[in-house]
Amino acid sequence: MASRAGPRAAGTDGSDFQHRERVAMHYQMSVTLKYEIKKLIYVHLVIWLLLVAKMSVGHLRLLSHDQVAMPYQWEYPYLLSILPSLLGLLSFPRNNISYLVLSMISMGLFSIAPLIYGSMEMFPAAQQLYRHGKAYRFLFGFSAVSIMYLVLVLAVQVHAWQLYYSKKLLDSWFTSTQEKKHK
């Protein structure tokens, strides 16, 4: 764009946008955290579906007990762990703080608590396996307690990160609502 003062008018070279075109940090964080939580929810869904498949095969006796062991007691309440994830997903479209808080509280009850109970329930079998080398439950020829401890460790990590990101998202949403109230 040419002008009488010279080849280009001041401020029209495209470098004047930086002071105007900025997305507030809490909005950027909100988008990033929602994406991370969604990824963790999908990983949780895969773990949950594998657990449902294992329990279904065990209860419906599709395979012998030598191939797939009967479920441990902690696996039944852990099936409810899908509810906090669904509440979390429902909270995203309109930044619903109450759904996110409910999701975090129910995650402790339906996800973390059964995993803690599961680690205590399987500990004697794991101790016997590693001291004496004897396993009594199997999953496709492998020790069921070893495989289930791996699943348990993975699930604890997924839920811990999910809680961490949910707390950060909640803080981000509170920041944006506080700024709206001050205006």
Swiss-Prot record:
InterPro entries given in the database record: Jagunal (IPR009787)
UniProt GO BP: defense response to fungus; endoplasmic reticulum organization; exocytosis; granulocyte colony-stimulating factor signaling pathway; insulin metabolic process; insulin secretion; negative regulation of insulin secretion involved in cellular response to glucose stimulus; neutrophil differentiation
Bilayer topology annotation: Multi-pass membrane protein
Subcellular location: Endoplasmic reticulum membrane
Lumenal side: 61-71, 118-137
Membrane-side (Cytoplasmic) residue stretches: 1-39, 93-96, 159-183
One Pfam match: Jagunal
Highest taxon, organism lineage: Eukaryota
Tissue specificity remark: Ubiquitously expressed.
Keywords: Disease variant, Endoplasmic reticulum, Immunity, Membrane, Phosphoprotein, Protein transport, Transmembrane, Transmembrane helix, Transport
Signal peptide per UniProt: none
Phosphoserine sites (modified residues): S3
GO cellular component: endoplasmic reticulum; endoplasmic reticulum membrane
TM spans (from-to): 40-60, 72-92, 97-117, 138-158
Role description: Endoplasmic reticulum transmembrane protein involved in vesicle-mediated transport, which is required for neutrophil function. Required for vesicle-mediated transport; it is however unclear whether it is involved in early secretory pathway or intracellular protein transport.
Protein family per UniProt: Belongs to the jagunal family.
Disease affiliated with this protein: Neutropenia, severe congenital 6, autosomal recessive: A disorder of hematopoiesis characterized by maturation arrest of granulopoiesis at the level of promyelocytes with peripheral blood absolute neutrophil counts below 0.5 x 10(9)/l and early onset of severe bacterial infections.
Binding partners and assembly: Interacts with COPA, COPB2 and COPG2.
This protein's name: Protein jagunal homolog 1
Organism, scientific name: Homo sapiens (Human)
